[in-house]
Amino acid sequence: MDGAGESRLGGDGGGDGSVGVQIRQTRMLPDFLQSVNLKYVKLGYHYLISNLLTLCLFPLAVVISVEASQMNPDDLKQLWIHLQYNLVSIIICSAILVFGLTVYVMTRPRPVYLVDFSCYLPPDHLKAPYARFMEHSRLTGDFDDSALEFQRKILERSGLGEDTYVPEAMHYVPPRISMAAAREEAEQVMFGALDNLFANTNVKPKDIGILVVNCSLFNPTPSLSAMIVNKYKLRGNIRSYNLGGMGCSAGVIAVDLAKDMLLVHRNTYAVVVSTENITQNWYFGNKKSMLIPNCLFRVGGSAVLLSNKSRDKRRSKYRLVHVVRTHRGADDKAFRCVYQEQDDTGRTGVSLSKDLMAIAGETLKTNITTLGPLVLPISEQILFFMTLVVKKLFNGKVKPYIPDFKLAFEHFCIHAGGRAVIDELEKNLQLSPVHVEASRMTLHRFGNTSSSSIWYELAYIEAKGRMRRGNRVWQIAFGSGFKCNSAIWEALRHVKPSNNSPWEDCIDKYPVTLSY
């Protein structure tokens, strides 16, 4: 999430000139044992029924195959005689069968495969340990004592480690903030991830038919997608898209857009690049709600190769199963809870509302309520639905049954927006520490890399050797707007980490014990 609600810190120096820092606990995610809106359950079942034809035809085909395998020569002879004297019936049945098969072929969802993905690993000289971060913040001369103390407290409670990265421009005193520096950061991240992706997959850039790039806060002209087209000399008829201003959940949105394009354009590849740009979006003011992103956001990016080619199934890592998107932008509080604006001195930054955690919780609740019917075992769905009905009949006196999502997924990639979000999701979804390990360790090692964080988490699970054939992964991301988006993947094989994984040189050190 765009800045995850850690503790809210505030307060100014006392009359004696000393720095005072107050910590006010913000409202955490709402308890999911509270009310669940039935209309979102209905929406989930609508998505399920949309694939009902496929669900019905498969068991029917199995039954017919079993019956046919049990027929002996006498049965076949009797069937042939019956067919000779019922020609009209046979023609009608054949027409119905052909029609049914045609409808199935035309309406069945075509598979979208994830061939491979790559996450950018910045060079060591871009690391920003706590001490260096605080020293550079002090030397800029832009922050007063209260703001510096506030940032120190946030860092200590953030869940970030000492090895996260900030862009090159921020390592100078004063920082070298310019359009050229921002372009350089974008190029290093995007091209670094793409170079590794093309090397690992042996796919030629000319074979890419669809390109989707998402970056929330940096949208130059020409666009980031145009920079990639120029760098790799992609073909002239490529369908390229550049998503801006959509926050930390834009990675899943980009995957959803690429999926829709792959369903229309056959036999092609799609590349999804997710990143964020820090160079021109560092806040040099003293407003507390706008300082939190400085402490959490770090350099990172990912590149994902998707395919709709049937022959790619054998070498692909995952198959895309579902994407569920929730947008609460119609609500004014949700719309403004993560908001880019200027402070009283005219300095631009991203402001985080005190209601952020509560809004994130409501948006998440809507998202998982819609997702449930698509992924949960029938036993969980029955319990979930029945308790909702009973609750409706008895005016809210009965708490809804919260499904066990661990029965639907083996792995969870929760956006590493901040420690508080991960803690609350672990509690409310009743997850074990191992289920949120990838999120915690990604936050510790790389910080909040915005929309690409869910890919660093998936890379962590692979590096640990935990991904098995048939395992399902739930990627869940939050972002400004306010949005909550989920992507569900199924592993097609026992997945090994790709070459030059971002965890390659440090996976043996993890998990680490965190103390706040």
UniProtKB/Swiss-Prot annotation:
Give a brief account of the tissues where this protein occurs: Expressed at low levels in siliques, flowers, leaves and stems.
Q: Per the entry, what induces it?
A: Repressed by herbicides such as flufenacet and benfuresate.
Outline the extent of the FAE domain.
104-393
Where is it localised? Membrane
Quote the Pfam families the UniProt record gives. Answer: ACP_syn_III_C, FAE1_CUT1_RppA
Tell me the first and last residues of the signal peptide.
none
Task: Provide the reaction this enzyme catalyses.
Answer: a very-long-chain acyl-CoA + malonyl-CoA + H(+) = a very-long-chain 3-oxoacyl-CoA + CO2 + CoA
Provide a GO biological process annotation.
Answer: fatty acid biosynthetic process
Q: Where are the transmembrane segments?
A: 48-68, 87-107
Q: What is its EC number?
A: 2.3.1.199
- Membrane topology, from the record: Multi-pass membrane protein
- Which keywords annotate this record? Acyltransferase, Membrane, Transferase, Transmembrane, Transmembrane helix
One annotated GO molecular function: fatty acid elongase activity
Q: Where is the active site?
A: 248, 327, 411, 415, 444, 448
**InterPro entries in UniProt:** 3-ktacl-CoA_syn (IPR012392), ACP_syn_III_C (IPR013747), FAE1_typ3_polyketide_synth (IPR013601), Thiolase-like (IPR016039)
Any one GO CC term of the record:
membrane
Acyltransferase listed as a keyword: yes
UniProt similarity note: Belongs to the thiolase-like superfamily. Chalcone/stilbene synthases family.
User: What is the protein named?
Assistant: 3-ketoacyl-CoA synthase 4
Please report the organism this UniProt entry assigns to the protein: Arabidopsis thaliana (Mouse-ear cress)
Q: What is the lineage of its organism?
A: Eukaryota, Viridiplantae, Streptophyta, Embryophyta, Tracheophyta
- The gene name reads KCS4
